[in-house]
């Protein structure tokens, strides 16, 4: 019973971390990375499909991504989708290959992205704390119903607190890493 609550909390906290990781991957740093474009939806025969499912995305050099569609007729729709994504990117097509050069970030844009990173990290921290609160409430319910003792409740709360601290430390680490990447010129 107690282990179920702890395991459930752990899996939910890990999902929050995964969500943060996904959100941070969408933010553009100075370096080219395929995750910048993977979430872009392309019109593939009238179905919105992620770019990663209709083309291969590769790093050509630190500031350029190259996209190779698996079908010739997808070059145009992919180019349009990248422009519509409003990432400030201008794709250039050479035959079947679409090259996407990444312009350097301005200081103002870097600061704005760093603020977004801090906001996303705070959302993740709040989600993790909410999970902790729910787990602690579940433990209190079990204690009120006399299914567990006070000592067991305290031990479980301590375990959940350690788990929470570890997850929040991971959030802080991910956020500071992303901020450092953003501020690197």
UniProtKB/Swiss-Prot annotation:
InterPro entries: Ribosome_recyc_fac, Ribosome_recyc_fac_dom, RRF_sf. Gene3D superfamilies: 3.30.1360.40, Ribosome-recycling factor (1.10.132.20). It holds the Pfam family RRF. It is found in: Cytoplasm. One of its GO terms (molecular function) is ribosomal large subunit binding. Keywords: Cytoplasm, Protein biosynthesis. Signal peptide: none annotated. Its main location: cytoplasm. GO terms for cellular component: cytoplasm; cytosol. One of its GO terms (biological process) is translation. Belongs to the RRF family. Responsible for the release of ribosomes from messenger RNA at the termination of protein biosynthesis. May increase the efficiency of translation by recycling ribosomes from one round of translation to another. PANTHER family: MITOCHONDRIAL RIBOSOME RECYCLING FACTOR PSEUDO 1, RIBOSOME RECYCLING FACTOR. This is Ribosome-recycling factor. The gene is frr.
